[in-house]
Swiss-Prot record:
Keywords of the record: Ribonucleoprotein, Ribosomal protein, RNA-binding, rRNA-binding
Keyword rRNA-binding: yes
Name of the gene: rpsR
Protein's organism: Chlamydia muridarum (strain MoPn / Nigg)
Protein name: Small ribosomal subunit protein bS18
Quaternary structure annotation from Swiss-Prot or TrEMBL: Part of the 30S ribosomal subunit. Forms a tight heterodimer with protein bS6.
Amino acid sequence: MNRPVHNEHRRKRFAKKCPFVSAGWKTIDYKDVVTLKRFITERGKILPRRITGVSSRFQALLAQAVKRARHVGLLPFVGED
């Protein structure tokens, strides 16, 4: 039997480099709201690694920084409509 080939239509994924590693960052500061806003959606959700290209270490630090900024009041819990 001939199987249909579905792999021809798949897009090639390019390896994204972590922007924090490329810039030489060691930690992420929760008070740096401008940087944190680049990694959250309009609704206030943290973007996943597959979209942002952030490494696993910095994704954990990013999530922790966003949550701290929310509790302090620098970022909203719910996005701005």
